[in-house]
A protein has these predicted regions:
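Short, surface-exposed beta-strand/loop "edge" segments at domain boundaries and coil↔beta transitions
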Residues: 17-18, 68-70, 101-109, 143-145
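Charged, amphipathic alpha-helical segments
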Residues: 64-87
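Acidic surface patches and DE-rich sequence motifs
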Residues: 11-12, 21, 42, 80, ...
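Beta-strand secondary-structure signal
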Residues: 58-62, 96-98, 132-136
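Short, cationic low-complexity segments
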Residues: 80-97, 152-166
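Solvent-exposed edge beta-strands and adjacent loop segments
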Residues: 1-71, 113-130
């Protein structure tokens, strides 16, 4: 099968983060913007098209594992001696992110800026409280923003993954 599907696991800054709701990661980027260039001498259309904004790649998701440890791993803040979470002033953190898919591929975001948008889903008997996350794919120092690793390839090494069971 050639389709990429199913959210298996999300690693952010080298650590597995907790559950994402059943909607998984949803595209939230913007399309590139082009400007047409017209010449007075050419009457039937533009002579060129210039990309004025390259757009951006982004995803959104709802984090439903709101354990103190998970919140610290995902958007920062601190955990005190009693296990309470104190949020940071800015609800954001930037680090590599790996999306492991049920189909076997791993999608690496080399420089993912994760921002806590706001709480989602409410506190009620119909669902669980979540933290809405926005994930922007920024370029790293080598100019890379993402790469899709084939089934069985370790994103850390780029080589076939070693099976620990032999």
């Amino acid at each position: 099968m050639k389709a990429i599907y199913g959210l298996n696991e999300v690693k952010f800054d080298g650590q597995v983060i907790g559950w994402i709701d059943e909607q998984g990661l949803q595209p939230a980027g913007t399309a590139p913007t082009q400007v047409d260039v017209y010449a007075a001498q050419v009457k039937d259309g533009p002579i060129a098209t210039i990309t004025s904004n390259p757009g951006k790649k982004a995803f959104t998701c709802n984090l439903i594992d709101l354990s103190t440890e998970n919140l610290v791993k995902t958007i920062g803040g601190t955990k005190d001696a009693n296990g309470n979470w104190e949020p940071p002033e800015k609800w954001e953190k930037t680090a590599p992110m790996d999306i492991s898919c049920d189909s076997g591929e791993t999608i690496r975001f080399f420089n993912a800026k994760v921002t806590g948008n706001d709480f989602a889903n409410g506190i009620n008997s119909q669902g669980v409280l979540a933290l809405g996350l926005n994930i922007e794919l920024l370029k790293d120092d080598k100019g890379k923003s993402l790469k899709i690793f084939a089934k069985g390839i370790d994103p850390e090494t780029g080589a076939p993954a070693v099976n620990p069971e032999g």
